[in-house]
């Protein structure tokens, strides 16, 4: 399974999002630190979920980072997060 798909599946299971978009931006970082041949190192996530209601931006990021801890400890070098509650979207 590709990293992008694994990220999407884990976030879906953890947060039951109303919307989720996972973008592989690795191609934009060729030649930069953390880039590896084959990509799948730099990602951007847009997620809207009730789970984020009443949570601070930092708390939301922590929730996502905990969910993706194995990916962040492994092949993922960078993860940009845009997490919102439904009323904020």
Feature map (PLM): residue ranges:
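Solvent-exposed beta-strand sheet faces enriched in polar/charged residues
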Residues: 23, 46-48, 82-84
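A short, structured beta-strand/loop element
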Residues: 31-49
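C-terminal structural segments of small proteins and small subunits
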Residues: 55-89
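A generic structural signal for short beta-strands and their flanking turns/coil linkers
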Residues: 16-18, 39-43, 75-79
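A short interface-forming secondary-structure element
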Residues: 47-57
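N-terminal first-folded block
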Residues: 1-34
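Short, flexible active-site-adjacent loop segments at beta-strand->alpha-helix junctions, enriched
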Residues: 26, 51, 85-87
